[in-house]
Amino acid sequence: MPRVHAIEDYRNFGIMAHIDAGKTTTTERILFYTGKSHKIGEVHEGAATMDWMTQEQERGITITSAATTAFWNGKRLNIIDTPGHVDFTIEVERSLRVLDGAVCVLDSNQGVEPQTETVWRQGDKYKVPRIVFANKMDKTGADFFKCLQDIVDRLGAKPVAIQLPIGSENNFKGVIDLVRMKAVVWNDESLGAKFEDAEIPAELLDQAKEYREKMIEAAVELDDDAMSAYLEGNEPDEATLKRLIRKAVLTGAFYPVLCGSAFKNKGVQPLLDAVVDYLPSPLDVPAIKGTDDKGNEVVRKADDKEPLSLLAFKIMDDPFVGTITFCRIYSGVLLSGTGVVNSTREKKERIGRMLLMHANNREDIKEAYAGDIVALAGLKEARTGDTLCDPANPVILEKMEFPEPVIEIAIEPKSKADQEKLGVALAKLAAEDPSFRVSTDLESGQTILKGMGELHLDIKVDILKRTYKVDANIGAPQVAFRERITKKAEVDYTHKKQTGGTGQFAAVSFVVEPNEPGGGYVFESKIVGGAVPKEYIPGVEKGIESVLSSGVVAGFPVVDVKVTLVDGKYHDVDSSALAFEIASRAAFREALQKGKSVLLEPIMKVEVVTPEDYTGSVIGDLNSRRGQIQGQDMRGNANVINAMVPLMNMFGYVNNLRSMSQGRANFTMQFDHYAEAPANVSAEVQKKFA
């Protein structure tokens, strides 16, 4: 069956926002008005179509990015719903990677919030073209113009209003479309399905003219002919204006801002028009680059005639179909039943069932084309970030980067049956989410779960208990400390065992020095003249690496260290890779002691938004948690306090803050950097763990 929609008619986009800005509600309305959803799901009733895991429906936050296909004005929309909670930034990062464009939703009452900044920065990183939707215009305190100023102040971006609100709070009636210079007013009785063009209210006409002029001036800057015509007194027509706004979105010259209230069903259809008019098709964004099997850079254009390449960006466990792998097809055509190669893992796979997902309804399809986002059932080897491609034209597309977890908990199954279920469940959860790690504590034998924050791990434990029916005891959250050396150390070590039987002999000389922060572990061999034969070097590395996972201060992983093998000795008969491994292990441990290893702790960037009455208490409390106040700011009538606080002092903070502010303050926190722990903290940790 040939392609139904031309690739230039595709819009692969996501909706990004701070938690509670109304992102899921906006997505719901899009599905409702595009005819894909027969009933509007409300988040606060726990019934939203996109939020399809039980955990999401209860918490009213979106955790997993479900991909949905819908249609508007003859264009095919592939919508990826992204989570807005900071513990799930990995999901956002992953979906931004496969999107061509995004709608950034703001709460008009709050403006740009901490998580908006985070997702905006991630959007900048992947160069995602964006439009902005100022939502919740019906809310008390909604202020469209403050949102515009916030985008300048907090995101450092250039916003251009292409709509203005008609009224606000309870009197929010509709919007002024500055491109067409028309008012668009919604009929409250029709659930927002009916709306009509009207003349702009007289009292808003001057304001509309002023903002239209600003919009035109920003647009004509992108085109010399349009600029010349404008300077001669000729305004661009509607088609030219739309073309220039589209150009601005694609180049990031400015960001068009629209407004509405998804909850009150106002402003959603013009937002859909803007998605179609201004966001890119797969042909408008740069072709994806990758490397072939010889390591050469290759480009895959968004074209059905190109060799097949697709990227797995999400893996989910579906109760009906089993494992589902969400993929973005970048080039070529994918047919059900064909063989592909997972070039990242060098494994072959066969494509079985192919599904088009609509939130949690699914439609079986037999073929998919460049630009499509599809769900593949039953892939055995695929993990998030893997490339699948045509075996005759192997390619590995750009890798995704995943952050290191900063918090961990121990989990102990209550019975042998639970132990078996736990193993299967954790393997699936780790495959679905690369920021969730599972390891075994070698000394205690306990299973350790590592994640990005308390909520992240809470939800994983919840899934284990509900979905996989694992009954287990959960330990208190622990901080993921690290260790690093602070000065250069030189060591010589000889391992000798020559009593009876085959002997063991190996001598190594190391120079061990601190690497720059974030530089990781680096090994270099400067052996000349065969002082350590080549075949024993892997043994040397293995010995060092066995110590990296548990350092000498309190048994935590060693980071940012450079080890240089400068000399050594071997014995023709008694030396072996194992002997060099043993020697290197002991030498490296000695070097860590000599190099004055210290304990590093994760420092979190904390932002507290509180009514002014509680500012003193909040600051006093943060100081008592070893927090360093970075600054204060007013946002509306609330005080915003920014601080750097060690993670170990932030456990249970949510309840403390709630009682301190009578539930009126809230906070967000994300990992910022590792820093050396003070001596008293280090001693306390050593006593507990060493």
Curated annotation (Swiss-Prot):
PROSITE patterns assigned to the protein according to its UniProt record, in alphabetical order: G_TR_1, G_TR_2
Keyword check for RNA-binding: no
Presence of the UniProt keyword Transmembrane helix in the record: no
Domain tr-type G: 8-283
Location in the cell: Cytoplasm
Top-rank taxon: Bacteria
Pfam families, per the entry: EFG_C, EFG_III, EFG_IV, GTP_EFTU, GTP_EFTU_D2
Binding site for GTP: 17-24, 81-85, 135-138
GO cellular component assignments: cytoplasm
Function per UniProt: Catalyzes the GTP-dependent ribosomal translocation step during translation elongation. During this step, the ribosome changes from the pre-translocational (PRE) to the post-translocational (POST) state as the newly formed A-site-bound peptidyl-tRNA and P-site-bound deacylated tRNA move to the P and E sites, respectively. Catalyzes the coordinated movement of the two tRNA molecules, the mRNA and conformational changes in the ribosome.
Listed name of the protein: Elongation factor G
Organism: Rhodopseudomonas palustris (strain TIE-1)
